[in-house]
Every structure is written in structure tokens, then in C-alpha cells.
């Protein structure tokens, strides 16, 4: 789909996606952000510098951190910056999850609607995931706007990280302390 720049905040629902990116994308094309708003800003800078659509990944609870840069920077009414936002859908209605994710999951679609961010939902059982992703990328490119992909629990196949030392030089928790 022509996307070759990735930034975001890792999420348990996206761990297999993130592991694949970590192993298969150049370090300069994958930046783990401090928070989701920062990831939106990094992706915006990438687009402005290269005119290439980036992908931002996050857990749905992180969308709150991303609202300001999405509305004041990326929105079609402002600078019209296209990007794909891959969101791990924690707390999806009808899917067992931790209590802290229930409300965010319940309002996820309505929140994207309120923000006027078009979206598609994907899951491992669907036959047309590639079509949905193509539709999102085409819409982002055509309308020059953020478009979201909501990934349901279990969407991505298990991926074992091959190069465990390829961690963008991230310190372990113990090293940081």
C-alpha cells in the first residue's frame, strides 16, 4: 500500500504487528513515540517532509492523547495531513477485557465519528482485510485526511521477533531506573 514509515505507542493487541515492524523496517522508518499525540506529530512531520502517507499505531485509550494534534494539525479543515491510524480496539463491546477498557471500547466508533475520522474495522476472520486497508489508504490519499483502522482482538497472527537486540536502542525498565 506504499506505507513505509511507522510511529506509535506499542499495544498488547498490536504486539505481533509491532514485532513484525521492528524486525522488517529500517530503524529510521520506525519511531516508538513517547505518547500518541507525539506519534501524530511525528507522522505529520514525516508527511510534510516526504509527501508519503505514514502509519500511526496505538491502543484506543491513546486516542484521547491524539485528539489535539489530529484536530488542530491533521484535520482537513486545518492542514489536511493524511495518515493511517491503526488502533488496537480494547474493550470492544461483547469481547471480554479488563474493566478499565470497557468504556473506551464502548464509545470508540462514536468518538471517531465525532472527530470526523473515517474508519474500517478488521479482524482475523474477515476475508476482505486487504480491501479494507486499500480503501483506507486510498481515502487518506484522495481526501488528504487521517483514516483509522480498528483492529479487533486477535486480528494479527502470532509473530516471534527474530532480532531481539533490534529494539531501537530502548533501555529496559531496569536500566532506566
Labelled PLM ranges:
Residues 1-117, 121-177:
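Thiamine diphosphate
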